[in-house]
């Protein structure tokens, strides 16, 4: 069962969501712009969170994602600017472009140990992140330039408070502009 595209888009009365384990996919913009949504629990039955699913949910503070999710779609949590922490389950292999871009207060990120692909700008402009640990499973950062917008940087571009970057032993990542605009980096 899929939560259809834009099904609850702009429903400001929704404050908490605990999806049942019959749901397998959260559609594009399903809960986009639900301004008062503050807590989301995603069960292990969900394998994909589509693009913009929770974008611009400005009240979102707490997301619990269980094992089972394989892909987090583009801009899925774009501009969820009250979000402080995110734990990406180890089942996640791919995070598409700008999934968490503009989450201004996001401080702590735990990436999946099985993550292989991260799209451009995934954590772009997350100005509160101070430390990131890159797992050795990660093989590709999509550092795509341009596309007619100002998205001219890699996954962590514009994370101005980023101070420490740790690459897990065995990492073999090469990517253009991965940390472009991260002028606070002190330790690699």
Specify the residue positions occupied by each region the protein language model found.
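Structural signature of tandem-repeat unit edges
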Residues: 1-2, 11-25, 35-48, 58-71, ...
């Amino acid at each position: 069962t899929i939560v259809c595209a834009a099904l609850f888009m702009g429903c400001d009365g929704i404050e908490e969501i605990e999806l049942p384990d019959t749901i397998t996919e959260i559609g594009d913009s399903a809960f986009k712009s639900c301004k008062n949504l503050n807590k989301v629990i995603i069960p292990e039955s969900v394998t994909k969170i589509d693009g913009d699913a929770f974008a611009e949910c400005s009240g979102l503070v707490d997301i619990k994602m269980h094992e089972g999710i394989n892909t987090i779609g583009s801009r899925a949590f774009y501009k969820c600017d009250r979000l402080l922490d995110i734990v990406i389950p180890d089942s996640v292999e791919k995070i598409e472009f700008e999934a968490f871009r503009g989450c201004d207060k996001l401080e702590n990120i735990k990436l999946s140990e099985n993550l292989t692909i991260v799209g451009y700008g995934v954590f772009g402009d997350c100005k509160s992140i101070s430390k990131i640990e890159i797992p050795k499973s990660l093989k590709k950062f999509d550092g795509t330039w341009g596309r007619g917008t100002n998205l001219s940087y890699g996954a962590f571009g514009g994370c101005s408070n980023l101070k420490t970057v740790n690459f897990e032993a065995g990492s073999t990542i090469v990517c253009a502009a991965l940390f472009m605009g991260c002028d606070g980096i002190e330790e690699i």
